[in-house]
């Protein structure tokens, strides 16, 4: 951990990590904790460190011991704090304060990269390797809910790396190959499936009721969610990009392979 002047405040070794890509998920802040996803090809774990000191506060083993790279999300659902994580041959929810598991869904594949999204009704997961799946999950269960809490599932158009988005009644996703889909978020009915062009590594983002998809070629496709496929705009950075865009104070930031771009008025 570093302060804003770049001075290191603490460092912590929470255990071994065997993976081709190292720690690729983002740490997550929760109250006075820093939570780290330690899914790897060994004694996998999720761990929480004291934000001020770096001391270990809790560490929960992950029994499947399989590499994954998803960043957990934390939401309050039905009055219960949940930290939900795709990875290590499962989708599971934990109490972020203690690391105790609320519920788990087995599979549906081995490795995950994309983070989940939540729309107040369902959690949406997409992955992974070696098989691709999209799941909509009712997040109010306890124990193993594999057979009871999957609202709908789809395999065509699932992504491995890019995270999806939800806008109103619509769930939008782009596959790694650049094929975008729009679903009815509640029912799982696909409204359309269209090729955007080029591979996609960046996660989708939303702003002003629109969805933004940045391709590996650096082309941003802006789509209005709906039952019909509608491209609002298409912008070419003339530079490749593999990073997810970010929005701050009305401006869009995209990191290309050579430049950082700021787009706005």
Residue map of PLM features:
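Noncatalytic, solvent-exposed loop/strand surfaces
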Residues: 1-265
């Amino acid at each position: 951990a570093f302060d804003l002047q770049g001075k290191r405040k603490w460092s912590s070794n929470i255990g071994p990590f065997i993976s081709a890509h190292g720690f690729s998920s983002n740490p997550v802040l929760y109250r006075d904790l820093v939570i780290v996803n330690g899914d790897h090809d060994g004694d996998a774990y999720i761990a929480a460190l004291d934000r001020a000191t770096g001391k270990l506060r809790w560490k929960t083993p992950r029994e499947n011991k399989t590499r994954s790279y998803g960043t957990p999300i934390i939401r309050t659902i039905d009055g219960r704090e949940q930290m939900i994580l795709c990875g290590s041959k499962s989708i599971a929810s934990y109490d972020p304060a203690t690391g105790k598991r609320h519920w788990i869904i087995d599979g549906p594949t081995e490795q995950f990269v994309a983070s989940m999204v939540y729309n107040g009704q369902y959690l949406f997961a997409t992955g992974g390797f070696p098989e691709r799946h999209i799941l909509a999950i009712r997040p109010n269960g306890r124990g193993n809910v594999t057979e009871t809490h999957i609202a709908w599932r789809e395999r065509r158009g699932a992504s491995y790396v890019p995270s999806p988005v939800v806008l109103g009644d619509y769930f939008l996703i782009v596959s790694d190959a650049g094929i975008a889909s729009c679903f009815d978020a509640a029912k799982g009915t696909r409204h359309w499936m269209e090729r955007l062009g080029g591979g996609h590594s960046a996660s989708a983002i939303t702003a002003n009721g629109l969805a933004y998809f940045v391709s590996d070629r650096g082309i941003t496709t802006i789509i209005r969610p709906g039952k019909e496929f509608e491209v609002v705009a298409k912008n070419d950075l003339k530079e490749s990009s593999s990073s997810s865009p970010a929005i701050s104070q009305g401006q869009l930031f995209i990191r290309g392979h050579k430049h950082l771009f700021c787009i706005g008025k």
